[in-house]
Amino acid sequence: MNIFSFVYLAVFLLAGFCIARRALPQAGLSVSIPLGCGFGVSLLAFVPACFAVVLGFRLPALLLAAAVVAALAVWLARHGTPFTRVPDPDAAALWACVLPLAVVTLYLLHTHVLHLVDGSYHTGQSCYGDMAMHLGFIKNIAVTGKLPPVYPLLGGEHRFGYPFLCETVSSVFLVLGADARTAYLLPMLAAFISVYGMMWQPARQVLGSAGKACLAFWLFFMGSGFGFVYFLGSAEAFAGIFTGFYTTPTNYTAENIVWVNPIVDLLIPQRATLFGWCVLFPALYLVWRFCMEEETRLWRYLALLVLPLPLMHTHSALALVLICLACGVYTLVCRPRTKAVLAPWGWFALVCGLVWLVEMWNTVFAQSLDGQHMLRLHLNWINGQDDGTLKDNYFWFYIKNIGLVYLLLIPAFFHAKPKQRWLYGGGLAILVLAEFVVFQPNNYDNNKLLYIWHLLGCLLVASLLMDWFSKVRAIPWRALGLCLCCFIAMFGSVLTVGREALSDYWQWSADDIAMADYIDDNAETDAVFLTSDSHLCPVFSLAGRRILCGSGSFVYYHGMNYTAEYNAMHQLYENPDEVSLAQWGIDYVLFDSYVFSNIQNADESWYAARYPLWYENGGSRIYKING
């Protein structure tokens, strides 16, 4: 049924393209294609979810969503501006930036996502952790049909406070019959087109130059700090970049280097970031044109685009709010305070405010208020320590992590034009907030905000560098200077991407895959399994079934209090009893190598004496408790 999935996605992307054409009828394909992908993915997240809340996340809801979106596409095609090719002088520059990164991205997705090697699934360094969680969420939503979903990594009653629409965009294709790899990758391909293309287009619009946009593009996606210096001391240290586990010039915690490459360490492994930026970057483009270029009619399209954003990536939604606040202040200060100017802002705020409030009230907003270690004060991101001190000097921390872009921010700000400074004001608001307030248990995750501040800084620095070197009359010297700056600013990321391309880790064995397939075919969709808390548990990650206690590396950082489930897991393995099994609603109990390595006194004989052996393969055995 993969063909059906491709057709389904095409319907949403076609509708997105039609919306992009209607919003900007004079734009070339270099705008319409990535902007259309952004709209299409946004529709894919929002429309099926609206029907699924009422009908369940089942085939009828998905087909109704497709019918509505198809009808929208037909209406827009018939009543919109007739499609004509318009001059697009910047297309070559955009694709010259996007296509090389697209090739690298496709290769990494191929080797990192359920890559079958000799019967086992392999992955790369960056996906060894997070992908196991995303696969489980995607599968669980598809098999249970519940939206909002249950939280499948814990027994008992727990709110699903994670932005789950970044998962439903793949769950859709599982319901339609696609295999797990296809379902996982399909929406990511469209999202990457949006992210890459709509990072370049705002840069072009803000800076007024294709050359500056290209430099900003590479500074953001391939920029890095001075971490590579730590590996120049010996050939052995340099070679360790390509063999160690997270010993790269952009992720070397021994020297407090933590400003990772956004492609290999954010977009590929972290779906919320990818799908958040897939909507946020087109939104920044529309915000600039809506506010700074006075195209007030665009507020409708901007609102439509960002409707699902809080449940795709909450950090991106917050970043957009702060940037819009800066642009709103600009409107009040620099433009006439007339109804024609202010009313679009009011309508935009009203529509998004109401929809976002409904989306977040019982999900991410509630979780941020009553979850464990969520909303709190903390100084200087990951450089700050719990006692209020800093690991490194504040400025040195960012100099060595971000490098040339950070060093040039102040001169770039004063070099910028007034409207560019106002836009960067939104970035400064993001920086200030992220440096003092943490929104989740993992301080590190505030980088989802900091990278948007950094993106706006890359725009200003690219403009500064291009203007500086344009004053150098001798073209060879101009080229040499730019090349030197690019080398200093990007060498660390080049090494990091090279390391990621070479990385190869075993993730799930053939026996794990076979067990997950059996569970998928034979276990009840709402069954609860007792397993170890390994982050690679195939019962959850591959079969999508709920487990009593998942890995602390997941549940803790989702703000969950899992003490009761963790203690119950150990008790049910070491000192089991039927009352506790019934209390936690356990339907199946798994014994495998993870159980015996992590729980030394696991008592399989107690279960073998009382319950039938439901499944056995290699070193894995499952006992059926109920029925």
Can you describe what each PLM-predicted range is?
Residues 189-192, 273, 318-321, 443-470:
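Hydrophobic/aromatic-rich transmembrane helices and adjacent perimembrane loops
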Residues 104-109, 222, 226, 312-316, ...:
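Transmembrane alpha-helical segments
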Residues 297-308, 323, 345-350, 416-438, ...:
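Transmembrane alpha-helix segments characteristic
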Residues 1-91:
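Membrane-embedded, hydrophobic transmembrane alpha-helices
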Residues 102-279, 315, 505-506, 533:
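Active-site lumenal/periplasmic loops and adjacent helix-entry segments of GT-C-fold
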